[in-house]
Amino acid sequence: MSRLGRIIVEAVAHTYGRDEVLRRLSHPFWFQSFGAVMGMDWHSSGITTSVMGALKRGLEPVRWELGIHVCGGRGRHSRKTPDELKALGDRLGIDGAQLTRHSRLVAKVDSAAVHDGFQIYLHSFVVTDDGNWTVVQQGMSPERKLARRYHWLSEGLDSFVDDPHAAIAGMPHETNIINLADHRAKQSRDAQVELVNAGPDAVLPHLHMPLHHDVRSGNVVMSRLRGALTAAANRCPVDFTELLLTRGVGQRTVEALALVAEVIHGAPNRFTDPARFSYAHGGKDGHPFPVPLKVYDKTISVLRGAVDAAKLGNDDKLAAIKRLDREARRMERVAQTGISFDELIRRERKRSADYGGRTVFGWAKNSMSASAERKAPAKNQESAQLSLWSDAVVR
């Protein structure tokens, strides 16, 4: 995960700039799609910790070159955030003390000003050389077996206590909560230190997600997926000649690349069905199918070559990946019929072993039925992973 995550971030930064990386990490739909295309369980609390952990590890070797730094993390790592930010400020010549104050205030708002029953256990602070930042936090409610993710973005942030979130992703609360960061809590804030000002914020779109973790046809906008697959089948012969000459690149790799290309280049409204991106590399829990390691490694190889060439001034391969995304959009408008989602998943499961399919439960085997494709986890294993959303609301 760390290798693929690093390459995608490098591609976004090279094409659109470092600040665009921050904007995308603060967008819950893109974040979920990013995790899914990396092979994470598309519908669990683990996607947040895994994505941020993978980014911190993956970007470490190139962070000074790239100018993007991931501080903090889960549990004890979150408590190291102030020291990491101060050290970063000293090296870059930016105000590390102010960044530390922002980090603490963000953590304090979500843990002390928002009383929603979720205890914060992850705090990841991503900052650029320019001092711009985004924060991804996650809290858990063990009693309800649910998690909630909080997104912050420094760009356009006027107040830390007046509807400051870029988004909050989680299940709607059944009971009343105390949210002192809501603009309607002005009278209460006026009586407390550092809680000032009030004002309305724009209403963000809603993302509704089910309780089940398996990927079903209803979770996917099939026209979008079919467009990507059709573009892969057509191979974009004029634009993709050089890419397709890469040793080992076949139709399945191009299918995965088409979805990765959309994560790099897609507009925000393209990420309303994040489950679709799990088709690129499956999921480590076996949903919708085991991670095809051969395809996964080839995707990394192609992207790595494209990004490295772009750093040397040759953008042809990176531009070719962008054209694949554009071709998928075009085919989406015309490829309205074809293989169904269920048939597509059955096909991937059937050939999973040929692609080096693997889950956290072991390697995929030939001639497996869909129901027996992976060993069922024990009850204590199921309870160890919290559900991120159930009819989730992003607000």
Identify the residue ranges that each predicted region occupies:
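Helix-turn-helix/homeodomain-like alpha-helical modules used for DNA recognition
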Residues: 296-299, 303-334
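Intrinsically disordered or highly flexible coil/loop and linker segments, enriched in small
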Residues: 43, 255, 266-270, 309-316, ...
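Phosphate-backbone recognition surface of nucleic-acid-processing proteins
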Residues: 251, 255-311
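Short acidic (Asp/Glu) and glycine-rich catalytic loops that position anionic groups and cofactors
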Residues: 9-14, 208, 236-237, 277-283
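Active-site-proximal structural scaffolding
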Residues: 27, 118, 221-225, 236, ...
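Structure-specific DNA junction-binding interface
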Residues: 1-212, 326-334, 345-395
